[in-house]
């Protein structure tokens, strides 16, 4: 039985190692839990110390550093910085600042944002006080101060227009005029065929049979030689639009509807307004050239019978400056430039030689006139002028009429002008005549009868004091036969005549267009004078925009002709002795009923000028 008892006892006993093994398993588990708890507690203390204690200390240091940075800067600018949405740290002793307005010397850049694909980062809005508004043309203005840059303040940016606005017209040159084959006049960069010096009237070089309406292509080709062209429009003092506006309208003035006449102008404006360069000043720094009178571009209505196109009445075009051979006295967006003459020198020496020759000529005629009467125009004084020339022993007349005439030969015209002390320049079909520039090129003192023929037209190229180079006889004095032109001119002392003639000869360089394939070195030609005038105009406008002022007080566009005559410092145009010459007729006084009598008359004059072109064509 013992063995059985022993066996039962054994089964009831526990091995001495068994409780130890069980106890060891529990102790091991407890140790692991304790180590994990200690580790978590340690890292919690470490993180708390780093982010709370050290973080608060760094913020305090940054706040203490900001005043010293501000004090180190020379100027003070107040700015408002919009706050970022950030989570504040749990630091009860340091609540987040409530005031977003900070006064510092220079803007403090915000911290770099964390990239977030779900939203677009927007930097803080900074509104500066005490500082003038920034304009996109500031960089161009600053080039003037760069004394090491010979082109500083003179850069021109040229739009790269589609060829339909210029070169394509030349390829289709037979359609440029209804009566004249313009193809030969577009040769030699727009100068036309060379003139032979058979009669010794011209010099041996630089003379061409130039069409009076060829300025479009001459000017554009001359621009290609301009020394200060730039491809960076932000540097440009002005922006040139090489649109052949005169050639364009010449194609469609007769026999085409207004839609066709307006098409190219509308397309041009649409093209320009889509360009980034337009946004700089909304076109106020843009300029273009048209070798025709302004009335070809100022159609007043949508009537098919009305004359010309409406380029200069388009809102966008009103911002641009258009250079024309005759401008409107009542509008502010066009400016007169000289008609082209026959002389286009390639070198300064050619200019000097011609001037010396004009000084030494013997002039046997007191006065002369080249032209035809205007029997259809009751206000024209040409008939009286022709009569006075015929009845004078010291007057010379070169009659121009239909058919063959010496008046159509450049050598005959220039020879007469070279033989005269004074050259009579009444109005043509419109205010101006090419003849005025041909005569001054010959050293002949011009006699004008209307201020719109020169004095209010070519203010960039002619002296403001017109008495230094010309004689003015009011039209009414001739029309009412109150004056003898011969007696009036004989009253001028010989010494004064000599001074006036010298002044005219000195003006020659700025009245002619140099050969577009070259450039004069020391002399400024009509192109140079025109470009500089445009740059000056744009520069004044930009400076006025920065200063928040206007150039004139109470500007009245209908009195545009007066402003160029103001003395420096004058800001308002009042009454003028020439007001009667530019007063618009009231409705009905000129046969019109639209209240635009003066413009209507000028449009009729434009039509007549085309008839004269048919008569005076040189083929």
Swiss-Prot record:
Induction: By salt stress. Pfam families: Exostosin_GT47. Disruption phenotype: Stunted growth. Changing residue 290 to V: In mur3-2; altered xyloglucan, but normal endomembrane organization. Residues 1-26, 576-619 are annotated as: Disordered. Changing residue 539 to I: In mur3-5 and cie1; stunted growth. Ubiquitous. One of its GO terms (molecular function) is glycosyltransferase activity. Keywords: Glycoprotein, Glycosyltransferase, Golgi apparatus, Membrane, Signal-anchor, Stress response, Transferase, Transmembrane, Transmembrane helix. Its EC number is 2.4.1.-. Its main location: Golgi. Residues 55-619 are lumenal. Interacts with CSLC4 and FUT1. Involved in the attachment of the Gal residue on the third xylosyl unit within the XXXG core structure of xyloglucan, the principal glycan that interlaces the cellulose microfibrils in plant cell wall. Associates with other xyloglucan-synthesizing enzymes to form multiprotein complexes for xyloglucan synthesis in the Golgi. Interacts with actin and is required for the proper endomembrane organization and for the cell elongation. Not involved in the trafficking from the endoplasmic reticulum to the vacuoles. Involved in salt stress tolerance. Belongs to the glycosyltransferase 47 family. This is Xyloglucan galactosyltransferase MUR3. It comes from Arabidopsis thaliana.
